């Protein structure tokens, strides 16, 4: 098997091969969730979910056929001791040592970059989770995905939640936009995003520090993937300060799905049910602007009790569980070719 690095921004053939391999594994790896469309997948390989440098490697078997790939994310601002790994082998070519070879190759690259921990996620009960267990990887936490079916909202539940939220948040006004934040709001968005530091995270994982440049970079990645990003913020009526925000993205290639991204409330403004208010307002906005939506998917750490309670109040149903896995790079025998 030969493993070669490629540039997803210029090598569309390799990107398509990786997407086909990804799709082949979905019945086992992620049977319940929405697949990434070709444009979103290509944008992810090229740009990632964050601004950090990426390495994308494609494996070919002895006949030259693509059989697996991995994406290595190397954080540069925080968590410089860690590397995030996404690794997939074609469903028809599994259980033949290819995944182990790719893991060793990735570990070698991570070590060369000075990283000591590899991290990744695999659905509960999936081949990836079994592989991680075989490697004796640690599981420091678990994400839980939930789905809100928009065609059958829980009777009376959202109306009661709306009355509660509106009563508690009378000192705030709402503002909406699609796409990048207006110039007069982007600094406030960065400040509110900083509240994510309070969300549960793995031991030893450093919190992200948000600034305007990081917000703008995130917006550029969303635009490059062709996603429509609907944003609602709450502002303090007396000062105009941004107090909370929520964002839902829609992929035109999969118009029935809404992807709930971050929801955050700045510390000084907590206790006014702003998270609940914004999510209810977003449902109203999507009903008007994206009437084709049939469901919204979201994910939370299993320990994020507050946001889970809000999602339960709105009628989200548990879809599946995705443990995080960590492995010390030193525990993976590195592929010498990865150091070349």
Give the positions of each predicted feature.
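A short, internal acetyl-CoA/4′-phosphopantetheine-binding micro-motif in the GNAT/acyltransferase core
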Residues: 60, 84-95, 235, 262-271
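Acyl-donor-binding surface of acyltransferase catalytic domains
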Residues: 76, 95, 103-183, 322-327
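Conserved beta-strand-loop-alpha-helix junction that forms the acyl-donor binding cleft
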Residues: 91-94, 119-129, 266-270, 295-308, ...
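Conserved acetyl-CoA-binding loop-helix of GNAT-fold acetyltransferases
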Residues: 95-108, 133-134, 265, 271-284
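Short amphipathic alpha-helix that is part of the acyltransferase structural core
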Residues: 1-47, 51-52, 60, 161-213, ...
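Conserved beta-strand in the GNAT
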Residues: 56-58, 65-74, 84-86, 231-233, ...
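Conserved GNAT acetyl-CoA-binding A-motif
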Residues: 82, 110-123, 286-299
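A short helix-loop-beta-strand connector motif used in the catalytic cores of GNAT acetyltransferases and
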Residues: 45-58, 68, 220-232
